[in-house]
Amino acid sequence: MSRRGTAKGKTAKYDPIYRNRLVNMLVNRILKHGKKALAYKILYGAVKKIQQNTKTNPLSILRQAIRGVTPDIAVKARRKSGSTRQVPIEIGSTQGKTLAIRWLLGASRKRPGQNMAFKLSSELVDAAKGRGGAIRKKEETIKMAEANRAFAHFR
């Protein structure tokens, strides 16, 4: 039996301008090669574009987009008797938000467009309206979980 203690969960820090944890989580996922200033520049540019295009509060659009993409259930690969099965599992709110942010950024990176700020802003607006690549990814995951419902007892 392990004598090592369990790690304490870390809370996400707040963003310096908007004082929002979601914004900080997004910045940390945009971050590549330690260039945090560039990540902030991309996100703030996207927020400014959302403000200009929709004439509404960009943080509410951001929250709405993440809430729309956040899954309740996901599939996890489990090996059982020589074959790998996709087992549906329920996921918590923090893990769901993390997945949603990852899917939003992945979908925005695949989009055609000028720069990342433009692509991210259009993906966030689309996700808030219930369409876009990230919403498609969520629906795919839900379909996979429904199809593999028979393996739910393998948890």
Swiss-Prot record:
Gene3D superfamilies: Ribosomal protein S7 domain (1.10.455.10). PROSITE patterns: RIBOSOMAL_S7. Its main location: plastid. The keyword Lipid metabolism does not apply. One of its GO terms (biological process) is translation. It is found in: Plastid, Chloroplast. Keywords: Chloroplast, Plastid, Ribonucleoprotein, Ribosomal protein, RNA-binding, rRNA-binding. InterPro entries: Ribosomal_uS7, Ribosomal_uS7_bac/org-type, Ribosomal_uS7_CS, Ribosomal_uS7_dom, Ribosomal_uS7_dom_sf. One of its GO terms (cellular component) is chloroplast. GO terms for molecular function: rRNA binding; structural constituent of ribosome. Part of the 30S ribosomal subunit. HAMAP family: Ribosomal_uS7_B. One of the primary rRNA binding proteins, it binds directly to 16S rRNA where it nucleates assembly of the head domain of the 30S subunit. Belongs to the universal ribosomal protein uS7 family. PANTHER family: RIBOSOMAL PROTEIN S7. This is Small ribosomal subunit protein uS7c.
